[in-house]
Regions:
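Short acidic/histidine- and often glycine-rich active-site loop of Leloir-type glycosyltransferases
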Residues: 56, 63, 99
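Glycine-rich anion-binding loops of enzyme active sites
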Residues: 1-18, 42, 53, 177
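Glycine-/charge-enriched secondary-structure boundary and capping motifs
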Residues: 86-198
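Intein/HINT protein-splicing elements and their conserved insertion hotspots or analogous self-processing inserts
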Residues: 23-58, 71-76, 169-198
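Active-site rim beta-loop-alpha module in soluble metabolic enzymes
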Residues: 9, 15, 69-89, 94-102
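Gly/Ser/Thr-rich active-site loops/lids in small-molecule metabolic enzymes
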Residues: 19-32, 63-67, 112-127
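Glycine/charged-rich beta-loop-alpha catalytic/anionic-binding loops adjacent to active sites
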Residues: 62-68, 89, 137
Length: 198
């Protein structure tokens, strides 16, 4: 897999949180305004003009989460990966972009190839900002990577004979291996337990 996973999904979570914060401020303001108008309280109405200006100049808090926001709002396909593979003489046997989440897109790839797979939880590439934001939101970072989507990284398979070549390519990680279709699609957790991908 190229790049890292879960960042776009966590960027969406940050955007949604800031949207909620903004609308809560607007709702509270409208409630105060309605009360002040009903009471015809000119002092409160005057004070609410300042509060309205503050709401109108609302700036979301994206500090330390710029990478996540960019991954959500400005996704980029990793075109350089294809060039790196060509230069290394590696011909993928199957490839898909990760737009629906690693789990879903890996299942598509396996279905099309009539194969199964095993992926390792501890091999899934996750950026520090993604991990920190998952912790802040009390979300499981593996769940964000498996089910988040919109990362637009490349998920691909290569022949075993090319494994040594792939290790030298920056921003590409081997996260698992292909099996017979009858063995299904599973995540091997950090503790060694296997969980079926859904």
């Amino acid at each position: 897999v190229s790049g890292d996973l879960g960042a776009a999904y966590m960027g969406l979570q940050v955007l949604e949180r800031e949207k909620v914060v903004y609308y809560q401020q607007v709702e509270e303001f409208n409630k105060k305004l309605k009360e002040a108008q009903a009471d015809n309280n000119k002092v409160k109405l005057e004070a609410l003009k300042v509060e309205r200006a503050a709401i109108e100049s609302f700036h979301p808090d994206f500090a330390g989460k710029e990478y996540l926001i960019d991954r959500q709002l400005k996704p980029e396909a990793p075109g350089e990966v294809l060039q790196q593979l060509r230069e290394a003489g590696i011909q993928p046997t199957a490839m898909i972009d990760i737009s629906d989440g690693l789990s879903s897109d890996l299942k598509h790839l396996c279905k099309e190839g009539n194969v199964g797979c095993r992926i390792y939880e501890d091999k899934i590439p996750i950026d520090y900002q993604t991990a920190a934001t998952c912790e802040e939101f009390n979300m499981n970072l593996t769940t964000a990577a498996l089910n988040g989507g919109e990362d637009y990284e490349l998920l691909f398979t290569i022949p075993i004979s090319d494994h040594a070549k792939i290790e030298s390519i920056k921003n590409i990680r081997q996260i698992g291996y292909i099996t017979e279709a009858k063995l299904g699609e599973y995540l091997i957790a950090r503790d060694g337990n296997e969980f079926q991908l859904t």
